[in-house]
Design a protein with these regions (language model features):
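Phosphate- and divalent-cation-binding pockets in alpha/beta enzyme and binding domains
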Residues: 56, 82, 188-189, 215
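Acidic active-site catalytic centers that drive phospho-/nucleotidyl reactions
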Residues: 49, 180, 211
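Alpha-helical architecture
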Residues: 6-7, 100, 178, 210
């Protein structure tokens, strides 16, 4: 285990040991290492939870990746498994989830998947961490070498909803369901999944996104 990466990525209290500056540096390092691995411009899928700090960290990560010539596909607020699935489906070089799971809202984290949707190898993770902690400046890209943010990613959420629904064989027609979305990242995925499975009478608790009450993601 490294100085930054724990068993579940980089985690900390936002504004203390997890800052926008660090997230920018993490984005830079990920793009550089992926480019070394691939030999060409990398693409990264990014998702996040509902925490108040997730937007800020997402922006910093995307800026760092683009600064080093990587492209990003932000899919917005979405459950962690969705990023693993979409990274593989989109043939991306990596996926990033901004989340600290069940931890209190002041915490957040940066979890990185491989392009196959699995945990990064220890070797690649170590190279990324070495870049982050190095005092050597990274060479900024210029002109056409700068990375881009892809737009129109709403369809990717739809793809994940369809995938989840396809894995459930039960017909929910006529069932009354109570779903607790815990103010988390599934808050706008769950209703569509239940609808596709035929449920017509569904009640939700903690459905809306809540920046300081994200319980489970």
């Amino acid at each position: 285990m490294g100085k930054l990466f724990g068993t579940d990525g980089i985690r900390g209290i936002v504004g203390e040991n997890l800052t926008a500056d660090l997230a920018f540096r993490v984005g830079q390092a990920i793009a550089v290492v992926l480019q070394e691995e691939k030999g060409s411009r990398p693409t990264v899928v990014i998702g996040k939870d509902t925490r108040i700090s997730s937007d800020m960290l997402e922006s910093a990560l995307m800026a760092g990746i683009c600064d080093m010539g990587g492209d990003v596909k932000p899919v917005g607020t979405i459950p962690t498994p969705a990023v693993a699935y979409l990274s593989r489906q989109e043939r991306a070089d990596a996926g990033i989830v901004i989340s600290a799971s069940h931890n209190p809202y002041e915490h957040n984290g940066i979890k990185v998947f491989s392009g196959q949707g699995y945990k990064l190898s220890d070797a690649v993770e170590a190279r990324i961490e070495e870049r982050i902690l190095s005092d050597a400046p990274m060479k900024h890209r210029t002109r056409g070498e700068i990375g881009r943010r892809h737009h129109g990613m709403r369809q990717l959420k739809r793809d994940y909803i369809d995938f989840v629904a396809s894995t459930i064989e039960s017909d929910l027609a006529g069932l009354k369901i109570l779903a607790d979305c815990a103010n988390g990242a599934a808050y706008h995925i769950a209703p569509d999944v239940y609808h596709e499975l035929g449920a017509t009478a569904v009640s939700y608790t903690h459905l809306r996104a809540h920046e300081t009450l994200a319980n489970l993601v």
